[in-house]
Curated annotation (Swiss-Prot):
Any Pfam family matching the protein: Glyco_transf_29
Family: Belongs to the glycosyltransferase 29 family.
InterPro entries noted in UniProt: Glyco_trans_29 (IPR001675), GT29-like_sf (IPR038578)
Lumenal topological segments: 32-509
Name this polypeptide is given: Beta-galactoside alpha-2,6-sialyltransferase 2
Catalyzed reactions: a beta-D-galactoside + CMP-N-acetyl-beta-neuraminate = an N-acetyl-alpha-neuraminyl-(2->6)-beta-D-galactosyl derivative + CMP + H(+)
EC number: 2.4.3.1
Disulfide partners: 237-507, 284-436, 454-465
Its biological purpose: Transfers sialic acid from the donor of substrate CMP-sialic acid to galactose containing acceptor substrates.
Topology within the bilayer: Single-pass type II membrane protein
Glycosylation sites: 241, 352
Subcellular location per the Swiss-Prot or TrEMBL entry: Golgi apparatus, Golgi stack membrane
GO biological process terms on file: protein glycosylation; sialylation
Amino acid sequence: MRFSMRQWRKLVLAAILAWALLFLGLLSYFLDNRVEEPLTPAGSLVSQHSDTRRLTSIQSSQQQQQPVPGLRSEQGLNSIRTSHGNQPEAGVLSSSETPGNMVNHIPSSSPYQTYGSQEANHQNDLDPQSLAAWSSFGTQNVDSNFNIASQHRERASQSIFSNNVEDEELPNEISPLVERRADADNVVQHMWRGTVSSGMLSPRLKRAMNDYINANKHHVSYQRHRKVARSAKELLCQMKNQSQLRTVDGSEQPFSSLGWADFVPLVPLQRWNKQRGGRSFRTCAVVSSAGAILHSGLGKEIDSHDAVLRFNAAPTEGYEQDVGTKTTIRIINSQILANPKHEFKTSSIYKNITLVAWDPAPYTLNLDEWFASPDYDLFGPYVEHRKNHAEQLFYILHPSYLWQLWDLIQSNTQEKIQPNPPSSGFIGILTMMALCDKLHVYEYIPSMRQTDLCHYHENYYDAACTLGAYHPLIYEKNLIRRINLGSEKDLLKKGRVTLPGFSTLTCGA
């Protein structure tokens, strides 16, 4: 009887242990998946798959906003309706429609409505009441609840660097703590090695990517040869030869008939870097807006460059230690001009620097269609700004340049990539390679500080900001990783990529 009681006790203890292990396993699985998904409440104005372009808050809040004042409403730009005899075809948006009305033309099943289609600042486009409600669910408790895995990542990376890991150890022997990261971090590790693919993405991001591919909003049809085994030198020369920097110069319709030749700067962007007594920029810094740049202490290093490129509404004030203070040129997407909440007319971050704007256009480069139905109405605000601030250099990138960059990515990728323009980051990198002798890019490929924090100046978390959904981000970053001339230690510790300027390359035709 005593022997059977002992067996019974062992059985009970074994059952308790089994249940404890099962509970811990389920808890670990639940926490990993919570990190993978962005935390957004039901009814939030943040889109289900907020990627790095359009905010779904536009859909409900912009109808209450005042139209952006600009030349679009004046007689000059309105004359395009009569001078060309072109009324927008059925299904094509009229330029007079507000962004809030634009979404009504997009089928409810469209990924451009579900996931978004422009890079933006997630918080800044919410009204204060909505922002307060959203923050109470989505970001106020991030540090204690949502981003547990990110805290583990930061502690792991701090441990690695405090132990003074040698250069040769970094790329090959990654700490076991880092190896236990979530799926998004495993993708970043493959990004460091240049071996990333869409099969490594989470189901959520793969689904968003496939939806964009199937929607093909810009009617992309790529029939050219793909070669994925180019050497770094071959890839650099392909970039130099096939990505010809170009801006809207007013010489093509519909811009020529509207007198845009009088609005655009006399100095082409291609020669912008020669304005300092004929000297080009020797060193340039491209500073991404990624959350990983926080606590980097890279500010002084960034400011030591001859020219510094920043993106969209990324500020320097309050973040000087990490991002520096100097801004020479800023690339902005069309939402910055069109959405009053970005304060394009009044904010000091857009003043006393060179501005370069861009907006998606059809792959066929139909400029009339683009002018009639831009993703966001940048044309009116652009002309108004040029009239009021003629002394400031301000350009709009030509759609042909954007799609040349997209072709470049697809031609070096065996997989079918998202048929949407590259990110502002990739556009900025290639633009500065055309203007500078040497380039340092910070946190475009994330360092060991990698986090799901989208932008260093916002409290919003989503892996899509690093890995992409709308933009072919993983493929862009794979290309930049392949041409990196810097050390692995610089990449992992600083998030710094070193690239040559096109002017320093010797390439055949």
